[in-house]
Amino acid sequence: MIFFDIETNAITDWDKLSDLKEMFVISAFDVDKNRMISCSTPDRIEKLLDYMSKADAICGHNVIGFDLPALKKLYGFTHKRVIDTMIMSRCIFADIRESDFKRKDFPKELVGRHSLKSWGYRLGVMKDTHGETETWEKLTPEMITYCEQDVNVTKTLFYHLMKNDPSKQMLNLEHKFAALIKEQETNGFPFDEKKAEKLCAVLTSERVKIKTEMQDMFPPTIQKMKTYWYVDKKGNKYATKRAAVEAGLKPNQVEKGEQKTREIPFNPNSRDQIAERLIADGWKPEAYEGKRPAINEAVLKTIGTPVALKLCEYLMVSKRLGQLSEGQQAWLKLSKDERIHGSVNTNGAVSGRCTHNHPNVAQVPASRAPYGKECRELFTAPKGKVLVGADASGLELRCLAHYLWKWDDGAYAKEILEGDIHTANQNAAGLDNRDQAKTFIYAFLYGAGDAKIGSIVGGSRADGKRLKTSFFEKIPAIKKLVTAVERNVQLNKSLRGLDGRILACRSPHSAVNLLLQSAGAVIMKQALVEFAKLAQHPYELHGNIHDEVQFSCDKEHADDLGQAFCDGIKEAGKILEFRCPLDGEYSIGKNWAETH
């Protein structure tokens, strides 16, 4: 195996590497020969790359994210077996933030990070600091030393990671998935900037209108000031005694009058002011964020008064504008060449789920949400192509059925596949209707407490406890699963995922949710990998959000590729030895609103 690292000119376009022009040095450590090699001229670099191409494996840190795309662009280099210690680190130590807090003198800015610098501190093999002052304009001797030290840290990190005996199945899956997601990041998601600007104008106008309406609902408050007016015998007011004297009066001709006041207009952006006004109207807060009452759309909807609903509307419109144009990661600010290149951490959550930033496309509102359809219409297909959205059918409940199989011999799975699972859940919990059953089961799966469960039927914590008790009595396998999983966490502080990954779990209360969320994440990662093998036509990945993908292709190939992804989901189930059969569905359209 060969460990390697490269240094190039300064990069600003990390999505497409359009400004990558030159590689100054590549350093490689050959394990078999126990030798470090550094090359800095084009001919020697090409010879080293040829040598590396014959190695059984090459390993580097974040090489799938940068080094390999750079080498492919500059030298056409690829390799069939790549090991990325960044990916390994994120999978094996997904909860490293917790242990970092316990490390003595560990830099705060590196807590929870998986960078080489962070690992240098953890392992005592410090990364060279030259890169912090390098301009990356030309090759320097210090740059070569810096590159070689990165290779040394990577090598030490790799062997440290392997001591944890990570699941080979997990590592294989995560590397393949990360390579596909890198393609997605490079592709970006086509974004209709002109339509976005029109939506921005609509939302801005709506916010002004709502704000005006709220000034009538919430008159300004009168606040007393520390200063007083000065008044003459005729009743004329002066801001200060000095002002009266300057107006021609003698000091004994004015006297101290009433205390000054000022109007404080209601500020709908102030959560404190919102809470004060609502409490004055009789609201009693139930949830707090620190010492302040929690104020959000869900809380305001629960209050349900005309005033609260108007505030809710204002917060919603402001949130949409924040996502669209005003926030630091607003879509219009990040759109380049009418594409948004969102970043994805392929193992950003402890469960193995992806996390998203710059921007967080997972937070684009659903079509059913206010202005959700208008937001999703902004994310489109490239000119001349169609967008295909595919997702797994009933994934959460099928994951539950898989884990229940041990205790119910597939009864819950059979109800999902052949019956009406929501009606079955309704009857088991003793709920009034099917919609309540849907809300109940998903709240239960996401770890909702008794009070939250009780609120589904407009009841109390006691009602929630009663519903769960009935549910457990009618479907005893669920109670057995919950008990077994919570006991496992109490004993081991962890669970084992579908692909053998270790899931660190700090709370037995959230254990079932963690197990099911991880199963769904692993299935969808495997499904994407299988889809890439099954696809018989060209396509471009644009989005991978929880249990759905969005990709574009020629219209005549859309059905074939949509079905290929559904087949990929089924194949993922077989590979992962999933007990409940999996399936998927797809939609074809011009934009994201039409495909999910």
For each of these PLM feature ranges, what is it?
Residues I2-E7, S18-L20, V25-S27, F106, ...:
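Conserved "right-hand" nucleotidyltransferase catalytic core of DNA-directed polymerases
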Residues K16-E22, E396-A429, D499:
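Metal-dependent catalytic core segments for phosphate chemistry
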Residues K21-F24, A28-I45, D56-M162, L173, ...:
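Active-site-proximal helix-loop-helix substrate-binding element of RNase H-like nuclease domains
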Residues D56-I64, D391, K452, Q550-S552:
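Short glycine-rich phosphate-binding loop at a beta-alpha junction
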Residues I64-G76, M88-D95, I274-G282, S393-D408, ...:
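Short active-site loop/helix that positions an aromatic residue
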Residues V202-K233, F471-T483, E556-H596:
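Polymerase palm active-site segment centered on the conserved acidic dipeptide of motif C
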Residues E263, G327-S335, P365-S367, G389, ...:
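Short, contiguous acidic/charged loop-to-helix segments that flank catalytic cores in large enzymes
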Residues T305, T346-A349, N427-N544, C553-K555, ...:
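Conserved catalytic core of nucleic-acid polymerases
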